[in-house]
């Protein structure tokens, strides 16, 4: 786990961030982590949660940009400006 905390959260994929977040939740629920370490990994968990939410918002925006015809069939996509 210690090596994971060195990785910048903003560089993680959704899958990697959610995997690490699940690991943190399990460790905290186990109750065997010392208090100071619990606080540290909780903070990391909060950052991971925000990253996952951000990536989900971006994915939702991309899906929302899919254009459809009158019958509801996808006809293409509109450009999306994600920064």
Swiss-Prot record:
It is found in: Cytoplasm. InterPro entries: Exonuc_VII_S, Exonuc_VII_ssu_sf. GO terms for biological process: DNA catabolic process. Its EC number is 3.1.11.6. It is an enzyme of class 3 (hydrolase). Pfam families: Exonuc_VII_S. It catalyses: Exonucleolytic cleavage in either 5'- to 3'- or 3'- to 5'-direction to yield nucleoside 5'-phosphates. Keywords: Cytoplasm, Exonuclease, Hydrolase, Nuclease. GO terms for cellular component: cytosol; exodeoxyribonuclease VII complex. One of its GO terms (molecular function) is exodeoxyribonuclease VII activity. The keyword Zinc-finger does not apply. Belongs to the XseB family. NCBIfam families: PRK00977.1-3, PRK00977.1-4, xseB. HAMAP family: Exonuc_7_S. Bidirectionally degrades single-stranded DNA into large acid-insoluble oligonucleotides, which are then degraded further into small acid-soluble oligonucleotides. Heterooligomer composed of large and small subunits. This is Exodeoxyribonuclease 7 small subunit. It comes from Bradyrhizobium diazoefficiens (strain JCM 10833 / BCRC 13528 / IAM 13628 / NBRC 14792 / USDA 110).
């Amino acid at each position: 786990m210690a090596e994971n905390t060195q990785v910048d959260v903003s560089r993680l994929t959704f899958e990697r961030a959610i995997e690490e977040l699940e690991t943190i939740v399990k460790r905290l629920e186990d109750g065997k982590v010392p208090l100071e370490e619990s606080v540290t990994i909780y903070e990391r968990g909060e950052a991971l949660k925000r990253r996952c939410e951000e990536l989900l918002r971006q994915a939702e925006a991309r899906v929302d940009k899919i254009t459809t015809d009158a019958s509801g069939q996808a006809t293409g996509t509109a450009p999306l400006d994600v920064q």
